[in-house]
């Protein structure tokens, strides 16, 4: 029961992030462009089998560098604009994952002010692919809001990792690295980051550890978890005390993902009957095996919703003109559609980068330095099955107003797993109101969040 209660606590942390904010247009565009590349005849990632991640290829040597003094050097004194009375420690800096290539990943770590010595350790990953997890730190579930007095959640000690190299402040001194980035290299580097980070923060080596994330992190989270699972079997390897994974509105299976998108768009009055009928008539595989008409209707399906936030179909947009940014701030839901522009401005200030121990650079929400994404499996459901047999707690949660990776996609993917139901669909509540719904399967839990996007 302890493990289940802990997972509920971690899920609550992620859900509050969803209830407070709804998503980022640039991250939506990154995933949208990535998925459209799969449907077009343009160069797209190699849709390989998940089986590359196995006992042989998923094992990595103990690449551990000396970390003495690094934790103290990474401690943040105060961030510009930080409120008075902050009663927790936070850190940021780089962990080298390949000294020969000069490749290093940037992280921000916030300790819990309450019970930090016993609360679990959580790794948070934003998706994209190629989008920064500092979006999560400063807009979703981190301790601060930029230009906003947002709530703070202190249920865990959280690492926000900018991954892969080329995203945010993370970098490589070998430019060819940016031409060979994909799921494989991202999982490898994230694992090497973790074993070195635990050397830097040895007090967390035995702590219960959870991996969480959203969107394309449906790939990142599961592949990293399985990499840890494989390497934990090796002798003389750093043992990571992985207890579970939590994925929000995650892209985990191409076929059910696309069907879920198009069914959601039609049932939420964002697509015409004609377009929906065309999708169902000509769409079978959602790749180049389908007739040309399928591609035509797919384009119509993506264009018909118009200029809305795909990650929250009911949210206001940030109104920009040449002289200012106009915000339609919603004090009830604590949601400001312009918050990402504040973050973009804040993280590009020289004094902020200095306080974060970041290399002086131009920070962006999503990377344009990574030239291509070279590999991506069409489904990671087999990896989820393997993780289930290992005894890990697996939670999939979904905001019900996200049209990019909608609840329908998640439900269709779970149906594909053919899992027996342990506890039937039921509401869960927050502040005496229904916050969403939960259904427990054998080895997996599904949670929905009302009026929330990614």
Regions found by a protein language model. Give the residues of each.
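Terminal and linker regions of secretory-pathway proteins
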Residues: 2-454
């Amino acid at each position: 029961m302890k493990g289940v209660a802990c997972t509920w606590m971690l899920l609550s942390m992620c859900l509050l992030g969803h209830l407070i904010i709804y998503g980022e247009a640039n991250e939506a565009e990154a995933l949208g462009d990535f998925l459209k590349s799969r449907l077009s005849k343009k160069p797209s990632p190699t849709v390989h089998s998940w089986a590359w991640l196995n006992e042989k290829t998923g094992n990595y040597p103990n690449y551990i560098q000396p970390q003495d003094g690094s934790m103290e050097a990474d401690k943040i004194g105060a961030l510009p604009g930080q409120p008075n009375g902050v009663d927790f420690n936070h850190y940021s800096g780089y962990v080298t994952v390949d000294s020969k290539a000069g490749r290093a990943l940037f992280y921000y770590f916030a300790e819990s002010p309450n019970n930090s010595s016993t609360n679990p350790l959580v790794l948070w990953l934003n998706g994209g692919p190629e989008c920064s997890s500092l979006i999560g730190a400063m807009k979703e579930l981190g301790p601060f809001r930029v230009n906003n007095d947002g709530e703070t959640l202190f249920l865990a000690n959280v690492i926000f990792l900018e991954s892969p190299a080329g995203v945010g402040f993370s970098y490589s001194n070998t430019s060819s690295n940016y031409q060979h980035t994909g799921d494989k290299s991202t999982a490898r580097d994230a694992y090497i980051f973790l074993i070195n980070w635990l050397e830097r923060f040895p007090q967390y080596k035995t702590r219960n550890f959870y991996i969480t994330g959203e969107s394309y992190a449906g790939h990142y989270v599961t592949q990293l978890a399985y990499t840890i699972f494989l390497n934990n079997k090796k002798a003389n390897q750093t043992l990571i005390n992985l207890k579970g994974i939590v994925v929000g509105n995650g892209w985990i299976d191409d076929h059910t993902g696309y069907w879920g998108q198009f069914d959601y768009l039609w049932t939420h009055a964002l697509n015409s009957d004609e377009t929906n009928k065309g999708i169902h008539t000509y769409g079978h595989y959602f790749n180049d095996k389908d007739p040309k008409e399928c591609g035509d209707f797919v384009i119509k399906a993506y264009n018909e919703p118009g200029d809305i936030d795909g990650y929250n179909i009911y949210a206001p947009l940030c109104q920009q003109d040449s002289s200012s940014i106009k915000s339609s701030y919603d004090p009830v839901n604590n949601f400001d559609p312009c918050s990402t522009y504040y973050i973009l401005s804040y993280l590009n200030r020289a004094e902020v980068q200095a306080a974060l121990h970041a290399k002086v650079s131009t920070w962006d929400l999503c990377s344009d330095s990574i030239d291509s994404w070279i590999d991506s499996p069409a489904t990671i459901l087999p990896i989820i099955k393997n993780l289930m047999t290992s005894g890990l707690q697996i939670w999939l949660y979904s905001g019900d107003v996200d049209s990019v990776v909608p609840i329908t996609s998640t439900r269709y993917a779970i149906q594909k797993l053919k899992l027996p139901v342990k506890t039937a669909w039921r509401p869960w509540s927050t502040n005496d109101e229904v916050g969403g719904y939960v259904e427990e399967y054998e080895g997996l839990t599904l949670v929905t969040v009302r009026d929330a996007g990614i």
